[in-house]
């Protein structure tokens, strides 16, 4: 068992999956404890209950912007795979330079 499901190894070989996971609002996957850990890393001691939904909203907007720029770089290079460098350039374009991922 390779853990790849029913798709096989190659690209584009996957047939119809029997139990397709329904994509709900995935932003709820950013759990309350995860947000709490991020806040602790930033030095926060107490957290209001209203913070969690607000944080999810801000994170969603931020990721949408970064991913949109990264996909734009990918499409311009006529590729179908978003690379780490696409994300690095997208972050740099938004004024958030990230070191340690090449380039």
UniProtKB/Swiss-Prot annotation:
Residues within the DNA-binding region(s) = 17-21
Entry-annotated residues carrying N6-succinyllysine: 32, 78, 80, 92
Phosphoprotein as UniProt keyword: yes
Q: Where in the cell is it found?
A: Nucleus; Chromosome
List of residues that carry Phosphothreonine: 81, 83
Could you tell me where the Gly residues compositional bias lies?
Answer: 1-14
Q: Does the keyword Nucleus apply?
A: yes
**One cellular component GO annotation, for this chain's record?**
chromosome
Identify residues that carry N6-acetyl-N6-methyllysine: 6, 13
Keywords per UniProt: Acetylation, Chromosome, DNA-binding, Methylation, Nucleosome core, Nucleus, Phosphoprotein
The record's function comment reads:
Core component of nucleosome. Nucleosomes wrap and compact DNA into chromatin, limiting DNA accessibility to the cellular machineries which require DNA as a template. Histones thereby play a central role in transcription regulation, DNA repair, DNA replication and chromosomal stability. DNA accessibility is regulated via a complex set of post-translational modifications of histones, also called histone code, and nucleosome remodeling.
Official protein name in the record: Histone H4
Gene name on record?
A: His4
